[in-house]
Amino acid sequence: MSETVTNRAADNIRILSAAMVEKANSGHPGGAMGGADFVNILFTEFLNYDPSEMTWPFRDRFFLDPGHMSPMLYSVLALGGNYSLEDLKNFRQWGSVTPGHPEVDPERGVENTSGPLGQGHTMAVGAAIAERFLVARFGEWMAHKTYTFISDGGIQEEISQGAGRLAGHLGLNNLIMFYDSNDIQLSTETDSVTSEDTAMKYSAWGWNVLTIAGNDGNAIRGAIKSALNEKSRPTIIIGKTTMGKGAVKEDGSNFERQCSTHGQPLTHAGASFKKTIANLGGDPENPFEIFPDVADLYAKRIKTLKEWANTKNEEEDVWAAANPELAAKLDKFLSGDVPEFDYSKIVQKAGAATRNASATVLGAFAKGIENMIVSSADLSNSDKTDGFLNNTKAFKNGDFSGAFLQAGVCELTMASIMNGIALHGGIIAACGTFFVFSDYMKPALRMAALMELPVKYIWTHDAFRVGEDGPTHQPVEHEAQLRLMEHLKNHHGENSTLVLRPADAQETTVAWQLAIENTSTPTALILSRQNIKDLPAKTNRYEEAKQASKGAYTIEECENPAVILVASGSEVASLVEGAVLLRERDGLGVRIVSAPSEGLFREQDKTYQESVLPVNVPKFGLTAGLPVTLRGLVGDSGAIWGLSSFGFSAPYDVLDQQLGFTAENIYAQVKALLA
């Protein structure tokens, strides 16, 4: 291939990137201009996909970590025909398909929403794990590569520690990462903030490390070829690139390697936009153009890819004909449909902690749902994800026949990896840790909600009843924070996250069914450490617990209640005990409502909502979190008993007494409400 046209194509990407930012009067041109050489060679020579079916499941994937470099991605995808020049002109504008940071759109070639730095390449690790999981079950014929692009900022983010460690430990040789090492960031040069040896660090993690001149086409080409031949390690290609490559000032002098070009149009940064466009071989009066020889280069690549895809599809057909049962299973995995599973056959132990009830369900999943991966951040025997692990095995370097990821202590990394697994497709992703450590995971949870990924979060040790570990490990404000995600809508108008806090073992089974059936948003399951008494049932507790699918339902009824008691989780059982006193001492008519999900409840019709929580009946709420957690259900005229401070270190039954989570206090508080 002519290096002249290769360089012209990279310059075309630089021109389009700079022009997009200039026209929008907003954006980040410098990094995009420096990284253009790598993406150009990757997309014209190495990245395999089907141009006629961009979502073909066995395609190579490209994950962009630094979302601010979106002009580079949009430009290279435009050269391949996935965006129009008009799309590029509308960069960062209302209603455009080219937002400031890429938002997942695989039909156009955007594999991930690029969020805070570090998450993109960690999602790529997840996608690479997903590929190995599927290959272990269906064969190497479907093997494909995951490429990712990271910047200096992404390398500095703490999440890169977990991603680098795990990818190396698992020997993900299907993962190739280009590190755009231009030594410039927004406010400083990198040597002002770090002196680490990145190559040595990744080598210590077990990566194949290649260092090249990152704007040299031949060097890039050679490095990718070397990475493709690597059999046992992920590869990082450290490309020493030039920020703002090609930028010049009004007098024509060099304006490369300037911090100012990181996050503003070239004109504002101190460069001359028109002189830069001319310097790169473009027309300053018409920068939004694709050079004819570059268009031809990409057209030839598209033609080659279509021929390649036809061959791969033929290989798949041959394999499917020879393996009809496996082929049917693979189709079912890739469909994204809810797996068939009989939840009524799950036998729960009476009075179990909901984390233990979850373990029972997970054990059944390990045997009955073959396309599920579960992970834990070094807490599998405490968050009870070991219910799943005990019926499969953990991934090991070279062996992905199991279905459990031992992530180690890295909650954010784990959550972001789950996002990558979900983005890849074909697999149900779930991960667990203590609820208090959800603080570490929220950036990835937010990304899952934004991307509408059905990741399942298993959060145990849900309240102050963690006990002796004390306030550092006792969630108080966490449920209120998380339930705000039920109020936040995604771009399809749905609640961005499904939050479920089941009240007993049978409700936990139902909660898991709701989680598995939710294929359009993340689901959070908030589970107890301590045992919980089973809620009363007229006939069959499991059958009655199915009403949890409506978000809130009555577990104890009376014809004309004087008061309605509302809670979720273990507090519901406490309300049952308090109701006994209210009935025995005062003859009060009491209704008790279990409300595992306010978000689901508010999706029901008004008639149902009024039937469960009629406006004209006084309501009392009990929560082990902040009172605001229940305010939407209890209303402004009701009363809520909750916590207003951090917890304390003591046995949980002592804390129940000291903090007022007793039948006697419930009785007293309800009497005060009705006085």
Set out the residue ranges of the language-model regions.
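Catalytic metal-binding/acid-base residues of hydrolase active sites
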Residues: 154, 242, 380
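Residue-level marker for buried hydrophobic side chains located in beta-strands
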Residues: 148-149, 177, 375, 620
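DG-centered beta-turn motif at the end of beta-strands
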Residues: 126, 144-157
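Active-site flanking residues adjacent to catalytic metal/cofactor-binding acidic residues
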Residues: 151, 179-180, 239, 377, ...
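N-terminal hydrophobic/helix-forming segments and targeting peptides
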Residues: 272-278, 293-297, 303
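Conserved beta-strand elements of the Class I
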Residues: 147, 373, 564-566
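Thiamine diphosphate
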Residues: 1-145, 295-526, 530-533, 594, ...
